[in-house]
Amino acid sequence: MGQKINPTGLRVGIIKDWESRWFADKDYADLLHEDYVVREYIEKRLKDASVSKVEIERAANRLNISLHTAKPGMVIGKGGSEIETLRTDITNLAKGKRVHVNVVEVKNPDAVAKLVAENIARQLEGRVSFRRAMKQSIQRSMRSGIKGIKTEVSGRLGGADIARSEKYSEGTVPLHTLRADIDYGTAEADTTYGKIGVKVWLHHGEVLPTKKAASNEQ
């Protein structure tokens, strides 16, 4: 089971929190679709800004969005012009709700699965050998202090006629252990031979229950 399911979804409510945090008695479907549209817009507009995570919180007629990025300067823009345009566009998508955008800098992009996957995808688009791209990313991530990493690329690797998958890993990545902090990220590389999918799993160690949580269970 742990090998197949999305590691983040499996651990939500156990050691991971939701990325959309709000409650609705009615209009739930509309608000959920609004979240999807906003996330899709941010992903397209900030494709090159190394955005690893988008968190959305709602309160009354207000939308609070936290953007986790390795390139905050690109998101904010000169004199805050880019983030103001972003806020205006999201306000239109959110049907006039008040929008607040908070930018959170990612200090160590080599320890974030989404950014590692995007880096491998960029190298594949630049015609770098997939083996070299994966091995270099694994080495950089292991130097950043993580416990383990697993990478997988799928598609017409090296321009082969038949699509296949290749995996490389180092360290430990216990996907069945629910207390293991597994970060999972995906990306796509658009090459001349078609799309190549990239998946990355990072193991940051085990999250042990706090004393308060342990006492509640007892």
UniProtKB/Swiss-Prot annotation:
Residues 38-107 form the KH type-2 domain. Keywords: Ribonucleoprotein, Ribosomal protein, RNA-binding, rRNA-binding. GO terms for biological process: translation. GO terms for cellular component: cytosolic small ribosomal subunit. One of its GO terms (molecular function) is rRNA binding. InterPro entries: KH_dom, KH_dom-like_a/b, KH_dom_type_2, KH_sf_prok-type, Ribosomal_S3_C_sf, Ribosomal_uS3_bac-typ, Ribosomal_uS3_C, Ribosomal_uS3_CS. The keyword rRNA-binding applies. SUPFAM superfamilies: Prokaryotic type KH domain (KH-domain type II), Ribosomal protein S3 C-terminal domain. PROSITE patterns: KH_TYPE_2, RIBOSOMAL_S3. The keyword Phosphoprotein does not apply. HAMAP family: Ribosomal_uS3_B. Part of the 30S ribosomal subunit. Forms a tight complex with proteins S10 and S14. NCBIfam families: rpsC_bact. Binds the lower part of the 30S subunit head. Binds mRNA in the 70S ribosome, positioning it for translation. Belongs to the universal ribosomal protein uS3 family. This is Small ribosomal subunit protein uS3.
